[in-house]
Amino acid sequence: MALQRRFFQFVIITLLIPSFILGYTSAVHEDPPHDYHLEEYGYDFKAYPSYITTIGDNDFGSSMSHENGIFGLRKVDYGMDRVLDASKTVNVDDFGAKGDGRDDTKAFEKAWKAACSSTSSAVLLVPKKNYLVRPISFSGPCKSGLTMQIYGTIEASDDRSDYRKDGRHWLVFDSVQNLRVEGGGTINGNGKIWWQNSCKTNKALPCKDAPTALTFYKSKHVIVKNLKIENAQQIHVSFDNCVNVQASNLMVTAPENSPNTDGIHVTGTQNIHISSCVIGTGDDCISIVNGSRKVRVNDITCGPGHGISIGSLGYGNSEAHVSDVVVNGAKLCGTTNGVRIKTWQGGSGSASNIKFQNVEMHNVENPIIIDQNYCDQDKPCQEQSSAVQVKNVVYQNIKGTCASNVAITFDCSKRFPCQGIVLEDVDLEIEGGAAAKALCNNVELSETGVVSPHCQEEGGEEEEEAS
């Protein structure tokens, strides 16, 4: 009987173990990807029903409601983490790269071709050495997901003649899907030679384009994280016509006087989340321009630089649109601007449905600014009748100090005044504790909570606080 009992126990265990394993495996693989939660942004889309009115054909509250279309961003790895351990590894050294300061461009081209043509996911490995690389395009589409693991330093050539074929780009990822670029290494644009030859540094020189250090163009499902990008020739990182992007844990640095060295530039891109980045450059820490929507920015440290900017928009009488932007959680120190919207006269289109919240300013020259008369040229810009419409912009929980006596500037168009602008719990003062001013022209404004300074028409009295 004892033997028979043991036999039955063995049969039961044998039957149960596969079922448990199958059930566990199913549970692991069938868990849906985790959505970004509303609480993560602190963005209550129903918070302003009483004083944001219907503008045009759309209501601001409904246009910013919690929908799959708005919050299409997901905390997913696009399947890359699950297969990373089993990926094919392609080492640039195996293709002739030396990492000794001599030109390794050809080796990088060959290694990329091998990784991109792999039918299984691949890891392109850049070891901990210093690799000199001339302008290069990492072009797709690739046959499978790909990770570029950068442990070392990729350094740009400082010979400007190397950029004759394409003077606007250095490293380009073109038309790649399911891409990760990470590893803790450094991308060094070696930009000093370009800054010295900029018309902004020496006005006697002609104005010419300089390369963007790292460009992602027409790419989808992109993760860029854990990298240092420094001393770009011009813009450091550009996401151009991309969809579904996560950029996180990036350190972006260049000298304060380096011209046009924007940190992260977003153009024509949808569904992008920029988080946990430290940026200090000679231009905008983050710039968001035409064609961008569903942009989420949080946990940013900015300075030196020109702040976090939407625009410029409408240059050369062009049409431009930016919408659905949330900046939640930023610290700006010693920057020329804090949170800024800038548009040229003569343009058309709109910058709409935008929220800046939980922003801390320290000695910032222009903490809050909307400038519909932006003019970045030596000659005065001609006054024009058309403008990019700025509407439905919320500033919530903005606190700190300014380096000038004006903390808030709304310089809006006479013909296309700013509409649906909201200040809620804004407290800004001059460094040292003195009261600051707010100058406001042609703006439809509401205030709620404690707001200081109050808005006033330039040369006029303070507006009454909204009930």
Curated annotation (Swiss-Prot):
InterPro entries: Glyco_hydro_28, PbH1, Pectin_lyas_fold, Pectin_lyase_fold/virulence. PROSITE patterns: POLYGALACTURONASE (PS00502). GO terms for biological process: carbohydrate metabolic process; cell wall organization; fruit ripening. Its EC number is 3.2.1.15. The keyword Cytoplasm does not apply. GO terms for cellular component: extracellular region. Pfam families: Glyco_hydro_28. The lineage of its organism: Eukaryota, Viridiplantae, Streptophyta, Embryophyta, Tracheophyta. Keywords: Cell wall, Cell wall biogenesis/degradation, Fruit ripening, Glycoprotein, Glycosidase, Hydrolase, Secreted, Signal. Disulfide bonds: none annotated. The active site is at 283 (proton donor), 306. Belongs to the glycosyl hydrolase 28 family. PANTHER family: PTHR31375. Its main location: secreted. It comes from Actinidia deliciosa. Residues 1-27 form the signal peptide. Glycans are attached at residue 290. It is found in: Secreted; Secreted, Cell wall. The keyword Kinase does not apply. This is Polygalacturonase.
